[in-house]
């Protein structure tokens, strides 16, 4: 007779979880940041608010964003005028868009990841789907399973409305699933569409306009699993450890509320200051076991909440400008895509490392950190180990 302990041992993978493939996708509608203020004030019938428009222009100029992708086109917005009006009841119209489009965009990214992975999709055992919008039953995880034609026995986990830290959360969860289930192959998808947060300008709620200047749409997918099959599966990064923490004295710093008017975001405190003040503690806890204390000796993937967060983190830790190069590149090319950002940055980094002929997927370095920041203030910290290119 076998013991529970023996069964337990047999169920577990031998090695650490690895990221085996990454795929990304965006809507086709590309928005130029330099002309966005004119477009935004025109489409929301707010051109009379000239002072506010100048403020918004300055926000966009300082955003360090070059372009973004958005599902919401001028045509869609003209058909749904309530989405454009500040604080107009519009949740039904928004929901109708996102419950369809979030899984569809997720499917595009997933197909690219599955193709790179090179294994039949029937080998996917788990799905972790993450989005800030479009709560529905059955959810986006179910829709994705149907769209991709995955097995009905695939084990699904749906994460709604976590916010910008959740790119770290999905990696943490997938790591545990892969390491605790022998042979598990976890499809992770973060799909974010801003149709639920888009709204017209308000001179009394400038914090809501920060989001209008920063947020973009995008989806990213990964295949995560332990014990890669030699010659078949080619890991990109190994997942070493993962942690989550709430920052002290940060309650209410970022919050979002789903109401009849859509998902409203509020930035209530000095978010860049709170993050930069506390980030070293998370780094020390994560890297002390590895004997690493030089933050310039590791590669960096940080959620680009906005340029001020990156600037203050860089300053506080004395990071060389090139450390956040991949992070800033994604912010410039796509804006803040909430949970999907850090997956895009991982993709950018491994591609740039290969293109530049560097020795590892992590810019030629062995160890790295991935940070997610978001409502709470919640910080996700993932320690990564790169793979030889």
Curated annotation (Swiss-Prot):
Classification via Gene3D superfamilies:
3.40.47.10
The source's superkingdom equals Eukaryota
Q: Which UniProt keywords apply?
A: Acyltransferase, Flavonoid biosynthesis, Transferase
Q: Where is the signal peptide?
A: none
Catalysed reaction, written as an equation? (E)-4-coumaroyl-CoA + 3 malonyl-CoA + 3 H(+) = 2',4,4',6'-tetrahydroxychalcone + 3 CO2 + 4 CoA
Is 4Fe-4S set as a keyword in this record?
no
Q: Which residues form the active site?
A: 164
Might you name a Gene Ontology BP term for this protein? polyketide biosynthetic process
- Indicate yes or no for the key word Cell wall biogenesis/degradation: no
Annotated GO MF terms: acyltransferase activity, transferring groups other than amino-acyl groups; naringenin-chalcone synthase activity
Q: Which Pfam families match?
A: Chal_sti_synt_C (PF02797), Chal_sti_synt_N (PF00195)
What pathway does the annotation place this protein in? Answer: Secondary metabolite biosynthesis; flavonoid biosynthesis
Reported EC number(s) for this entry are 2.3.1.74
Q: Which InterPro entries match?
A: Chalcone/stilbene_synt_C, Chalcone/stilbene_synt_N, Chalcone/stilbene_synthase_AS, Polyketide_synthase_type-III, Thiolase-like
The record's PANTHER family line, in alphabetical order, gives: CHALCONE SYNTHASE 2, HYDROXYMETHYLGLUTARYL-COA SYNTHASE
Q: What does this protein do?
A: The primary product of this enzyme is 4,2',4',6'-tetrahydroxychalcone (also termed naringenin-chalcone or chalcone) which can under specific conditions spontaneously isomerize into naringenin.
Family statement: Belongs to the thiolase-like superfamily. Chalcone/stilbene synthases family.
Protein's name according to its UniProt entry: Chalcone synthase 2
| Organism classification | Eukaryota, Viridiplantae, Streptophyta, Embryophyta, Tracheophyta
